[in-house]
């Protein structure tokens, strides 16, 4: 597939020149109003296609969700720009909108989304772990992970990353840790699990470090992702509260059936619903999807990470980016993101991933907050009660059924290619469909643009309109102001 160009991608920010203004425009239904679906709809709309976007929720954004009930923006889903650099496909739009980023780390993206010196870790008795121990263990953890590359080269078959770590430690006794240092190592593993949104025994040795990582480190979206969603969605034909139940391909047309009995007909459809929804077979296909497509959906992993956001009357915690609790097992570790440092608001966000996150969803909001506060008070005995809280449930939310995709142990080599591939007039997009940047917002965005371009080319050939509805010359306003509008970064 061709990579998306900035020219075809951006929303509401173009002056376009298109031939054939009197021809009947091709029609496309985009299913899913997350950033991938909105990007696809925006791109096709800018190419003068007739585009209808159907979204099951009562809002846009999908797993990108900015909540304002605290009186400030809180992203309860995606919240970082992974790769603060011009190569990031979202960079032009973020710069143009003047959205501020708070950079939380350098380029060591796979291991950490925060620099080690920004952590304050505490043991079970509330004593802060000396920074030199945190730094030393972090360096040891990196050495252990580098040694797993040798294990990978020695084994043809895949294995869980934790198994490879055990092999490394058996071979290198000097890397083994005990006592408090061992607990800090478990906390590092906890953070690795959060990156992949799954437990370490599910993380693939062959694929854990194969992601194409952009430069520039990680940037927290201080204003949230909501302004990006609104900018891209401007003037699109959007239907909220439209849950798709069936997709029919017949006579070179695509019929999309909605839960309330309504049907929409178009020349093609782009499916951007989350991987978890596809895995649950909530949407029926007629004819059924081919086996190669079904197996790609089945073989891709889906992880879960949830947030418990807590607003307090005042700040009682140290001025660091992350507060962490170390423990003898990674599941017993925990951490809080300090939004006060980035935004000035007295907010902590507890983040839980993997099986622990699934267990959390069985609790009520109040029970979740009580548990989180009990952990916080062990770290900081003077902690006060929150005045407001928010709790996410991405795993059981019927509109998501998971947070983002992950590589399971033994993943077939061609898995992403099969998942991305179209089936007739059906095209697939979303974070799980981005080969190089799965699990990220910019990956989902880029995937939507690629699917839109593939759909445009397909319909141009099928409908015999190859000379029409082509994007000849697109002038992006951000191209004219790119030099004048740099990233707004509050921490260098």
Curated annotation (Swiss-Prot):
What GO terms fall under cellular component here? peroxisome
Nucleus as a keyword of this entry, yes or no, is: no
Its UniProt entry gives the catalysed reaction(s) as:
spermine + O2 + H2O = 3-aminopropanal + spermidine + H2O2; norspermine + O2 + H2O = norspermidine + 3-aminopropanal + H2O2; thermospermine + O2 + H2O = 3-aminopropanal + spermidine + H2O2
Query: Oxidoreductase as a keyword?
Result: yes
Q: Which Pfam families match?
A: Amino_oxidase
Q: Which UniProt keywords apply?
A: FAD, Flavoprotein, Oxidoreductase, Peroxisome
Pathway involvement of the protein, from the record: Amine and polyamine degradation; spermine degradation
List the EC numbers from the record: 1.5.3.-
Please list the GO terms describing molecular function. Answer: flavin adenine dinucleotide binding; spermine oxidase activity; thermospermine oxidase activity
Expression tissues = Widely expressed.
Return the cofactor note field: Binds 1 FAD per subunit.
Motif Microbody targeting signal residues? 490-492
Localization, per the record, is: Peroxisome
Cofactors needed by this protein, per the record, are:
FAD
The GO annotation for biological process reads:
spermine catabolic process; thermospermine catabolic process
Q: What class of enzyme is it?
A: oxidoreductase
This protein's major location comes to other
Residues noted as binding FAD in the record, renumbered to the chain: 55, 63, 244, 431
Family from the record? Belongs to the flavin monoamine oxidase family.
Q: What does this protein do?
A: Flavoenzyme involved in polyamine back-conversion. Catalyzes the oxidation of the secondary amino group of polyamines, such as spermine. Substrate preference is spermine > thermospermine > norspermine. No activity detected when putrescine, spermidine or N(1)-acetylspermidine are used as substrates. Plays an important role in the regulation of polyamine intracellular concentration. May play a role in producing hydrogen peroxide during seed germination.
**Protein name in UniProt:** Polyamine oxidase 5
Tell me which species this is from. Answer: Oryza sativa subsp. japonica (Rice)
Classification lineage:
Eukaryota, Viridiplantae, Streptophyta, Embryophyta, Tracheophyta
């Amino acid at each position: 597939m061709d990579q998306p160009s900035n020219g075809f991608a951006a929303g509401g920010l173009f002056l376009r020149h298109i031939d054939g203004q009197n021809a009947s425009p091709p029609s496309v239904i985009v299913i899913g109003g997350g950033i991938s679906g909105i990007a696809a709809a925006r791109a096709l709309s800018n190419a003068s296609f007739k585009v209808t976007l159907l979204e099951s929720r009562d809002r846009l954004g999908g797993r990108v969700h900015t909540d304002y009930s605290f009186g400030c923006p809180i992203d309860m889903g995606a919240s970082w720009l992974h790769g603060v650099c011009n190569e990031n496909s979202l960079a032009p739009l973020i710069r143009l909108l003047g959205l501020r980023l708070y950079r939380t780390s350098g380029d060591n993206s796979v291991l950490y989304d925060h620099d080690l010196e920004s952590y304050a870790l505490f043991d079970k008795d509330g004593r802060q772990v000396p920074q030199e121990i945190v730094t030393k263990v972090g360096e040891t953890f990196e050495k252990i992970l580098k040694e797993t590359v040798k294990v990978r080269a020695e084994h043809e078959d895949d294995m869980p990353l934790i198994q490879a770590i055990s092999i490394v430690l058996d071979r290198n006794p000097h890397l083994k840790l005990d006592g408090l240092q061992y607990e800090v190592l478990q906390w590092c593993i906890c953070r690795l699990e959060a990156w992949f949104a799954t437990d370490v025994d599910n993380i693939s040795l062959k694929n854990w470090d194969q992601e194409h990582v952009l430069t520039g480190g990680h940037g927290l979206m201080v204003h949230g992702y909501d302004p990006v969603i609104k900018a891209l969605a401007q003037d699109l034909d959007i239907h909220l509260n439209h849950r798709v139940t069936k997709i029919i391909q017949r006579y070179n047309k695509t019929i999309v059936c909605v839960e309330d009995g309504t049907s929409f007909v178009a020349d093609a459809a782009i499916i951007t619903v989350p991987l978890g929804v596809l895995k649950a077979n909530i949407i029926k296909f007629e004819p059924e999807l081919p086996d190669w497509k079904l197996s790609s959906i089945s073989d891709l992993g889906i992880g879960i990470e949830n947030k418990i956001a807590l607003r307090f009357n005042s700040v009682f915690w140290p001025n660091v980016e992350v507060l962490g609790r170390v423990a003898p097992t990674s599941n017993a570790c925990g951490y809080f993101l300090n939004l006060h440092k980035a935004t000035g608001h007295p907010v902590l966000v507890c983040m839980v991933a993997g099986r622990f996150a699934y267990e959390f969803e069985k609790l009520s909001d109040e029970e979740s907050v009580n548990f989180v506060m009990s952990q916080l008070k062990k770290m900081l005995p003077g902690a006060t009660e929150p005045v407001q809280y928010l709790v996410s449930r991405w795993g059981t939310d019927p509109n998501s059924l998971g947070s983002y995709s992950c590589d399971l142990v033994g993943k077939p080599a061609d898995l992403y290619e099969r998942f991305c591939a179209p089936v007739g007039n059906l095209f697939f997009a979303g974070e799980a469909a981005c080969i190089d940047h799965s699990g990220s917002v910019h990956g989902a965005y880029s995937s939507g643009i690629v699917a839109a371009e593939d759909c445009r080319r397909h319909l141009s050939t099928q409908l015999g309109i190859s000379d029409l509805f082509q994007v000849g010359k697109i002038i992006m306003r951000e191209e004219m102001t790119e030099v004048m509008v740099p990233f707004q970064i509050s921490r260098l």
